[in-house]
Amino acid sequence: MKNNLAIKFIAILVMSYLSCGSANASCDDAPIDGVDYSNCQFSEGQDLSRTYIPNSNLSFVSFIKVIFDKSIMMNSILINGNFAESSFFRANLYEANLEGGNFEKSNVTSANLTRANFKGASLIEATFKDSNLFESDFTGANILNANFEGANLNNAIWIDGKKCNLGSIGKCIK
């Protein structure tokens, strides 16, 4: 009987240990791979340059005027986040989901946004100069006065849901 209880206790400990392996974080925790900052509010104007947070959940967060220059954020979820006036200069957002996000007046110059999802995002006056937007999806996004000078838009899905042809550098050619 005691052995049976001991085995159950050890099994519970092992299961508890295994279930604690995720990278869920409170809003005060340091950024790491796979961190979950969903619904957090952060101070404006922070410098988070060179932050390494791939595979992270940043949905519904507020990062206004935050600097993410040269950060690694590939495969991260940034849906419905507020990144207004933030900087992503040379950031890697490969296959990131930015659906419904606010990136108004953000600097996304020379960034890797290959296969990024911008569906329904507000990109008003955002700058994507010289960025790689290959196969990104802009369906329903607001791109009023956005700057795509020198940006690779090859095979991107444009705001009207139509695919940009090869040779779409700086503007979508359909």
Regions found by a protein language model. Give the residues of each.
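Detector for methionine-enriched segments
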Residues: 1, 15, 73-74
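Bacterial N-terminal signal peptides
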Residues: 10-20
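Tandem repeat scaffolds
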Residues: 23-174
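Bacterial N-terminal signal peptides that target proteins for export
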Residues: 1-10
